[in-house]
Amino acid sequence: MISGHDFYTVMAAVVPLYVAMFLAYGSVRWWGIFTPDQCSGINRFVAIFAVPLLSFHFISTNDPYAMNLRFLAADTLQKLLVLAGLAAWSRLPSRTGAPRLDWSITLFSLSTLPNTLVMGIPLLIAMYGPYSGSLMVQIVVLQCIIWYTLMLFLFEFRAARMLIADQFPDTAASIVSLHVDPDVVSLEGGHAETEAEVAADGRLHVTVRRSSVSRRSLLVTPRPSNLTGAEIYSLSSSRNPTPRGSNFNHADFFAMVGGGPPPPTPAAVRGSSFGASELYSLQSSRGPTPRQSNFDEHSARPPKPPATTTGALNHDAKELHMFVWSSSASPVSEVSGLPVFSGGGGGGALDVGAKEIHMVIPADLPQNNGSGKEHEEYGAVALGGGGGGENFSFGGGKTVDGAEAVDEEAALPDGLTKMGSSSTAELHPKVVDVDGPNAGGGAAGAGQYQMPPASVMTRLILIMVWRKLIRNPNTYSSLLGLAWSLVAFRWHVSMPAIVEKSISILSDAGLGMAMFSLGLFMALQPSIIACGKSAAVVSMAVRFLAGPAVMAAASIAIGLRGTLLHVAIVQAALPQGIVPFVFAKEYNVHPAILSTAVIFGMLIALPITLLYYILLGL
């Protein structure tokens, strides 16, 4: 039976943590003491120094030779049971088409990864004595070294599948090597782009580079760009609401690319300042000051040119103005060559070192129903290796090149309106079902795509996980703390007093600063419940009911009884860990749910853990 003294001891250990949290919350929300920039600086100090040194302090002072292996086995079994259940569930057909891998990662985080370091150690010491604090440190070691690494592996696996399925929907099985540039630290979203080279045997050698958008975002001072007109607009696009006069002459354009000139119309019989010398010259924009573009995306639709018999492309693509840009060796420009148009290989096609253009046309875009709604689809330009060809990707579909383009361009859907200028990655990537029952391979189609060999994918994921780990201060603090504890408790070596006090002066502040940082995070959020009430209820049920239930079953199966069983169940009912939320936000996998689990879970965790403590003590 829990006495009043025991209850007060628990409250005395936990309430000060909440005082620090609410003090930070009020400093931002009520009193306006800290600005968002100042909060960011405080959070960075906590992430770089306070929490890693706190982890090092606890791990380095814990005896690794006295670890309770049965307790650790119960914790490991709980996580393996959850992983096995989620893996089996993810293989089932999805009725809604929602990615099962995303939900599997989120549910694993909610059910098995509590805030053991900040909340668990002081709470369990107050409840069950100092030995339970040692057990919590052992859990922290496994979390930092094994389970957070596994989380990174799952997130990078998901990002790699999405990247491969998006960039190589039909040819992924032909990839034999994946080289990752040193500056690529994540495969998620717009952080990476790909370039492929086709070998003589038809195999693909892919290079993963940092996205040009990510590189440009690092520039502090914007500089003039010599890239002019780097987009292809349609007449139905409303990106530029102010029309201006145009000097672009479609007759010049069709003459340059080998097609016959269109019949003169009032909209086209105007002098053009856009000539072949500008189109094909590499020196057209060498000057330090960028020139104003004369291209007008709002000019009248060009007339349909007559079809040519061989070699020349048929430029009757609906609602498209084709505009080619030039590039020079500017420090801002990401493109070193000049893309030019060429025909298939017959008469009339220009041959001035031109690259061949392949157009990827979507097969399932909705047709214009005349309702006046605009349908915009973003595409991408994929720089190919080998033959120097280029692919224009309009969101996925079949590739058209050479003479085949003459037959296929006529079927271009009206819904196709805009193609972006990104060199490899789509501005808005397609939603690819990577978790369907047919996701393992086969011909690319609805819900199906091919994957590279397992060895290639494994090497890619391990490279990315390793780069994440070596940039994480907690990795070093955990490994160094474990290494020192192995040496210190084996040969009874004491840490030098200067080093010990230097670490303790910061680690002592780590607990309070971690809670203070959490309060700042809560204050900066627009809502405590960011994911909706129903999702919040489900996440709280998984966190505080499903997790402890699986932990109880695993502990009983291992043979834990008495106080050890109680400690195992209560630590599984702690609030949600912060590190899984950081991962979820970085990889954009249900960040609202994890944010709600951290914030709202922290508010209700104290009464819930006290309820478990009282019920288990009966």
From Swiss-Prot:
Localization: Cell membrane
Keywords attached to this entry: Auxin signaling pathway, Cell membrane, Membrane, Stress response, Transmembrane, Transmembrane helix, Transport
Biased composition (Polar residues): 281-293
Cytoplasmic-side segments: 28-38, 91-104, 156-478, 524-539, 585-597
UniProt-annotated stretches for the region Disordered: 281-312
InterPro entries linked to this entry: Auxin_eff_plant (IPR014024), Auxin_Efflux_Carrier (IPR051107), Mem_transp_PIN-like (IPR004776)
Membrane disposition: Multi-pass membrane protein
GO molecular function: auxin efflux transmembrane transporter activity; identical protein binding; protein homodimerization activity
Pfam families: Mem_trans
An example Gene Ontology CC term for this record: plasma membrane
Main location group: membrane
Domain of life of the organism encoding this protein: Eukaryota
GO biological process, any: auxin export across the plasma membrane
Tissue expr: Expressed in coleoptiles, roots, vascular bundles of leaves, shoots, lamina joints and vascular bundles of the lemma and filament. Expressed in stem bases, stems, leaves and young panicles.
Residue stretches spanning the membrane: 7-27, 39-59, 71-90, 105-125, 135-155, 479-499, 503-523, 540-560, 564-584, 598-618
Extracellular side: 1-6, 60-70, 126-134, 500-502, 561-563
Induction details: By auxin and osmotic stress. Down-regulated by 1-N-naphthylphthalamic acid (NPA), an auxin efflux inhibitor.
Similarity comment text for this entry: Belongs to the auxin efflux carrier (TC 2.A.69.1) family.
Oligomeric form and interacting partners: Homodimer.
NCBIfam families, per database record: 2a69 (TIGR00946)
Record's miscellaneous remark: Seedlings silencing PIN3A display abnormal crown root development. Seedling over-expressing PIN3A exhibit better shoot growth, longer roots and a greater number of adventitious roots than the wild-type when grown on PEG-induced osmotic stress.
Function: Acts as a component of the auxin efflux carrier. Involved in the polar auxin transport which may regulate crown root development and response to water stress.
Name this polypeptide is given: Auxin efflux carrier component 3a
Organism: Oryza sativa subsp. japonica (Rice)
